[in-house]
């Protein structure tokens, strides 16, 4: 389960959020299947469930440079809708609002360098 609080620095539509979700990840070789159940308010997960119902909410890509990837999508008219830090603070996630163009959000995952 994701954890709320300032340590995860969750931002939804430009404002701090306490949104949470239960998460299960199944590793299937080079593909990870992530199942989310929103249990809090103000997140792209809850927004998708409320407007679209159950289904594929995002496709995730690991990136080395989140700012560069975010700028790429911004140039295509797609902005950041939801972002934060991993619960163990070793990386970040950024959701791009690409539902109008791609029917799903794009999630950018960044792992911090190992210390």
Give the ranges of each region predicted by the language model.
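Vicinal oxygen chelate
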Residues: 20-31, 48-65
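Basic/polar N-terminal segments that are highly enriched at the extreme N-terminus
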Residues: 114-115
